[in-house]
Amino acid sequence: MPRPMKWRKVCCLPESNRFGPLDLNAGDQYQVKMTVDEYETIRLIDLEGFTQEECAKKMNVARTTVQGIYIEARKKLAESLVNGKVLQIEGGEYRLCDGLGNGCGQGCYKRRRRMGCSGKEEGED
């Protein structure tokens, strides 16, 4: 029997989920898809300055898992920048942290409001 899925904890969704060249009407061959959990590792490690160990604790996964996610995220980011492809952030194996009782205790709800992060899961209106 396979191990049950361990969801990766994400503080907030990106305000914009599509980045790329302004002069390109990109089809699928000109897109790079980054998952929300890959985006979260870039945010925590590169923007917030956390170590991979600290990032792993925040996302509720092993450090080796974060390392793999981070490597893939950086490859996708580089491919988008170097090859002029649109970066589309969507999907992944994640759950939004509510920042409340069962949350991380790091004030995710307050941070989402301050940063303007979306608190809606994909498909919600």
UniProtKB/Swiss-Prot annotation:
Domain of life: Bacteria
Transmembrane segments: none
Family of the protein in this entry: Belongs to the UPF0251 family.
PANTHER family the record matches: PTHR37478, UPF0251 PROTEIN TK0562
Protein's name in the database: UPF0251 protein Dhaf_1981
